[in-house]
Design a protein with these regions (language model features):
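A short alpha-helical cap/connector motif
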Residues: 1-172, 176-226
């Protein structure tokens, strides 16, 4: 039986559990550890980077799916990019979208040190702009999408993504717990938590999609087309 402490919003037991999970699985690759350190030292928002456990889940999902076309919305310093690259098909392409070009020097420093880095294609701009201009005839249908961009626009991103997915395409949405504040009598309100609640409800009610929320990081929702 699952302990009820796992369902509490109090971060004490949850953080203990996350630390246990992170230290019980495969260790963080050296390149990613170096990028993690650089992110904390050279940016003001290191907390936006995926934790070690989430990164290993992204890498494992990518290895299972073996996408020929992968898409990441919200590159930040490129940590998740390198995790997804680990499982990319040898002939695949990983598209990643970031609007803040001040982060590009970190990409350019660390990505070339990864095997297969030449298959990363960086888009400078807004997530929705890339989705709206995506041409499946030239870029291909998307086998795996990792969504970690503008939370207020996450539902529009979902609707734009769905017709671009391959027949058995996967989507992963980050931060779908929003620090455990989306439910209960003191649930957070505002554009971002409201958008995430709407996303969770939308995914749950769609019979064409199979959805599971993983207790990873700040909540990682995996979605697969039936």
């Amino acid at each position: 039986m699952m302990s009820t402490s796992l369902l509490k919003t109090d971060l004490g037991p949850r953080m203990d559990l996350l630390e246990f999970a992170s230290t019980s699985g495969s260790p963080e690759p050296a390149l990613l550890a170096a990028l993690r350190t650089a992110t904390w030292q050279r940016t003001r928002h290191g907390r936006l980077m995926s934790d070690v456990h989430t990164g290993r889940v992204l890498a494992m999902v990518s290895r299972m799916v073996r996408p020929r076309v992968a898409l990441e919305l919200g590159t930040f310093t490129g940590y998740g990019t390198l995790c997804l690259l680990e499982g990319l098909h040898p002939e695949g392409t990983l598209h990643t979208v970031e609007r803040n070009d001040e982060l590009f020097p970190l990409h350019d420093e660390f990505w070339p040190r990864a095997e297969g880095h030449g298959r990363i294609h960086r888009h400078h701009g807004e997530a929705m702009a890339v989705l709206e201009n995506w041409d499946p005839e030239t870029l291909g249908t998307i086998d795996c999408a990792y969504v970690d961009a503008d939370k207020q626009g996450i539902n529009a991103q979902l609707e734009a993504l769905l017709p671009l997915l391959s027949k058995k395409g996967w989507m992963l949405f980050d931060n779908t717990w929003w620090n455990g504040t989306l439910g209960g009598p003191e649930a957070a309100t505002g554009p971002k938590p409201d958008a995430l609640r709407a996303l969770n409800q939308r995914l749950r009610m769609d019979s064409t999609l199979e959805t599971v929320v993983l207790p990873v990081g700040d909540g990682l929702t995996m979605v697969r087309k039936h």
